[in-house]
Amino acid sequence: MNTHPELIVMLTYNDVTVPQAAEVFAKCEHTRARYWGFKEAGLPFAEMRDLFARMKACGKQTCLEVVAYTEAECLRGAEMAAACGCDFLLGTVFSEAVNAYCRAHGLLYMPFVGQVTGRPSVL
C-alpha cells in the first residue's frame, strides 16, 4: 500500500486550462509529481494531445478533467480523453454509458460526486 500522499498537478485556473500549460509543464517535468492534467477547455485539441504525449514521454500519469452535465457532453469528454491517450477521465456526472466507454478504452473513470453546478464547478 502506498503510504505517501499523491497529488494531481492541474494546469488550470477557474476550470479552464491555462494558456501557458505546456511552458509550465516544461519547467516542472523533472519533478517527482506523477499525476498531471488539465481541463477539456482552454487549449485547441492538437495542443492538448501534444501536451499529454509530452507528459507521458516523461513518465507521468495523465488526467483530463471534463466539466459536463449531460450524458452526451460527458461522452464527448471521454472520447477526447481516449483520443489524447489519457490515463484518467476526471469529472463529469456519473453515467453508465461513460463508465462503459472508459472501460472499453482503458480509461480510469473518476466522476464528480454529489450535486455539481456551474463553471467553475461548485461541488
What residue ranges belong to the model's regions?
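Conserved N-terminal beta1-alpha1 strand-loop-helix module at the mouth
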Residues: 1-62, 71, 80-84
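Conserved anion-binding
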Residues: 59, 67, 71-123
